[in-house]
Amino acid sequence: MAGNGAIVESDPLNWGAAAAELAGSHLDEVKRMVAQARQPVVKIEGSTLRVGQVAAVASAKDASGVAVELDEEARPRVKASSEWILDCIAHGGDIYGVTTGFGGTSHRRTKDGPALQVELLRHLNAGIFGTGSDGHTLPSEVTRAAMLVRINTLLQGYSGIRFEILEAITKLLNTGVSPCLPLRGTITASGDLVPLSYIAGLITGRPNAQAVTVDGRKVDAAEAFKIAGIEGGFFKLNPKEGLAIVNGTSVGSALAATVMYDANVLAVLSEVLSAVFCEVMNGKPEYTDHLTHKLKHHPGSIEAAAIMEHILDGSSFMKQAKKVNELDPLLKPKQDRYALRTSPQWLGPQIEVIRAATKSIEREVNSVNDNPVIDVHRGKALHGGNFQGTPIGVSMDNARLAIANIGKLMFAQFSELVNEFYNNGLTSNLAGSRNPSLDYGFKGTEIAMASYCSELQYLGNPITNHVQSADEHNQDVNSLGLVSARKTAEAIDILKLMSSTYIVALCQAVDLRHLEENIKASVKNTVTQVAKKVLTMNPSGELSSARFSEKELISAIDREAVFTYAEDAASASLPLMQKLRAVLVDHALSSGERGAGALRVLQDHQVRGGAPRGAAPGGGGRPRGVAEGTAPVANRIADSRSFPLYRFVREELGCVFLTGERLKSPGEECNKVFVGISQGKLVDPMLECLKEWDGKPLPINIK
């Protein structure tokens, strides 16, 4: 990215630079964002600010979290621009917003430049704050991001403002003092006039100006300056300085930057969760084969498939699923449903949109976006429209639709996961108790997910087609950039709710598969022992043909879904005993013996260990071995690349296996994950799942 107005002769239209920004994988880009967000110092000079850095400063309370430094090399150019304005006025120059009125009244003239700046701030202080605690104030995190982005823009030296003002705003940032800005009231063209006027109002000491300190106290401008250590009193703005602060897109682009940081992380998370979904559903991993996606050409889908392929290639679940799917293949669907099988094709375009939106916002936070632009080298004040925040509005609309589509896929996968008719042998509603009549598992959670998804789909509608003309029809088209960014922030919150809920459900499914394997192993072991003990001889003391039925009995167990007989494996009314009876009866009929006696003996010995969710002390409804980690069959998740995510939920966050016998509700556990995601704690375990990926799909092997 060429900074400070430099033109690259080989790329005069900037298309080459825009294309180059998309080189490499999306995952690598997310890793870079995360690294940038963890830098202790953000040094800005006007053209190199990154989304991750904006997110970091937004979430930090003050310099102890992230310190902001100004590049001293910017001082001369900022000073030159400021001095040019004063010199131009002294020689009778006529400049918009310096000697003229504003917007639709720019035909008016004045020679009192400082007074004009005072009136600019007064009439733009049009925001409504309510009581100050009822949701009408912009969150301080967004204000911090806006201050950072505005400073970055003004450092480029095209705006006619003193460097000392930028230093003062930086001191406010570093001491955790955030001006109070109204949540609403901007159309982001001509910039974010109304909210930015409150930043200018604070540094000029307007009596209505307020700020919030790092400990949440509200203070006036004088106290804010004292806390920040700004000496010399309030600023009296020179001509153009008020306009330089307010006439820009920095609030919309700042919020958009923080939103896009989260959107990129959640996009990668959706890829990982789709792979985990395949694991717990005993899915068929061939949907990730590189040839399929290479033939469709879309890079987002190719990468999404490669990421899922990587996780599934190292999955113990997939080895087991292969065995399961090989049993009676002609009686099973040949392919999985769309929510799994087309997940790369669904997520790929969303990732492409999110990447493009991220780069557009990154260009905007490094742009000169006020009016007029002061060209010191040519001695001109260029009157244009860089304040038009259309890149923000359009990018946010596009990103929000992509976020809604990610949520739609997540809901479709979740709905399959909790539905016993679709989840390939898992329990109804992922219930974890012995008695399914007293455990409805994730039923309420599915209702909540439907609510989240519905609201998210509504938010997917565009904002930018609702533009209203303003300022005496001077601002007859405007971007609504901040409005769209706010709605995208809402969409991100809802996707976090959905992701949290889905993660808890997937971990429940992982443990149910573990339970399933141990129950089946226990039943097989018991049937084998009982068969060898009691089926060798018939009641008359002769060798029984039933002694040859052991293999068929084990095969019948393999073919029967464990949770159909989990209440009591020895119950004659449940499917397992009916299938075992059929095996013995077939042997009896073929040999002329009576099979009922053998079945009765088998039942009398009770298939112990097959009561899968018995209330063992401390087991939370699971057999003691599974609950205590001493089960004969280990949990396959420990031998899968998705394990770091599971470990994070179960160990770091302490989320438990849910059963009707416990008081712990699904919402309590989902909330733990939601807080973890919101605090950024999920990023490391998510990336750990992919640490071995080399950025390439598996090779296409031709036999």
From Swiss-Prot:
Q: How does activity depend on pH?
A: Optimum pH is 8.0-8.5.
Q: Which organism is it from?
A: Zea mays (Maize)
Q: Where does (E)-cinnamate bind?
A: N247, Q335, R341, N371, K443, D471, N474
State the name under which the record lists this protein. Phenylalanine/tyrosine ammonia-lyase
The organism's place on the tree of life at top rank: Eukaryota
**Can you supply a Gene Ontology BP term from the record?**
phenylpropanoid biosynthetic process
Q: Where in the cell is it found?
A: Cytoplasm
Cited NCBIfam families: phe_am_lyase
